[in-house]
Each structure stands twice: as structure tokens, then as C-alpha cells.
Amino acid sequence: MRSIYILLLCFLCSFSVAEAQILLQQYIDTRVGTAANTTASAGTFGKHTEEYGQTLPAVLMPHGMNFWTPQTQDTENKCIAPYYYKDSKIQGFRNSHWIVGGCTQDYGSMTLMTVTGNLKTQPEQRASIFSHTNEMATPSYYSVYLDDYQARAEMTAQSRSAIFRFTYDKEGMAYLIVNPNSDYGQGSIEIDLAKKEIRGYNLVHRL
């Protein structure tokens, strides 16, 4: 009889822990640290990126190979994170290796972006206005409404891959842009029609 009670107790405990872990995600906002510091000591060590936590609203698996984040900054340069809260336009969604809290450069990254209407490929030209009120950022799910294209973008990730969904509120042409983020102009894209694959390359440059 004792073994039955113990088994029942273990089952109830495991169920409670699993339920708690799921519910706790709703309290996590991965945008924390992407805005400038406003404390009394803000700017003590500099007035540029030193004022930021240098974090990013990434979706990822624990100990994953890479992660995905909205992109508001078009560069892999040192000390510039892919996303800052102050920015008003999103350029796409980046597969990133950014080291959170640091000042080393991103590397080997690429960005996906959807546009509608006239095709625009350059990051600053294709960037869409967005509102933080229409944005949701958790470790497992990110969503934002792209005002310029009347489309909602959603993404989630595994350790080496991601799943995207783009929902359009108007009819017409829609495009998916694949952009290797090489500041040295060394990135490239290959389209294999036979295998139905798109392969991208972006050589790594680290400081």
C-alpha cells in the first residue's frame, strides 16, 4: 500500500513541476536589457552601447547551437547587438551567434524577411515600422506585426533550426528574402531547384 501512495505522490509532484514550468514562461520578457540604462550610474563608462545590457529577444533551446532574434541593426560590427528597444523598424529575423552581455561581434549570421508589394531587398529599405504593443517576446516564441506589409511574423526555434509563420492581411505578391549578413561583402546564396533547397554562406570574421 505504501508503494502506491509513493507512486501517486511522485506523479502529482511531477505534474505540478511541469505545469509550473509552462506557466512561468509567460512572465519572461526577453527584451529586458535591450533599452538604455536609466539609473544614476548610466553613462559612467561611456555614452554609446555601454549604456545597454547588450541582450536580445532571442528564441532558442537551452545550450542550442544558435538562436533567432528580430533584427533592427544591419551589421555584425563589434559592440552592436542585433536588436535595440529604441528602434522603430524591423529589418528581418536573424540567425545569430551574438554573445549576450558582451561586446564581441556577431558572426556567421543570416537574416530572413518578408515583404509585400514592391520587392525591396536592402535592410534599411525593406525595414518595416512596428509597435512594441504588437510584439511578444518569450524564450520559446516571438511575434510581431509588420505595419508596412500588413503581416504578422511568428517564429520559434530548435537547437539547430527554426520555424516561421507569416500571415498576410492583404492580397498580392509576397516575398521571402534570405540575406547573409557579411559586412565584408563575402556572403552568398545558392538555390538548388532539384533539391528544393536554399543554402547561404557567410564567412566568419571575429575580433
What kind of feature is each model-predicted range?
Residues Q21-L207:
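Accessory carbohydrate-recognition regions in carbohydrate-active enzymes
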Residues I6-S14:
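Bacterial N-terminal signal peptides
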Residues S16-A20:
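Sec/Tat signal peptide C-region and signal peptidase I cleavage site
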Residues M1-I4:
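Positively charged n-region of N-terminal signal peptides that target proteins for export
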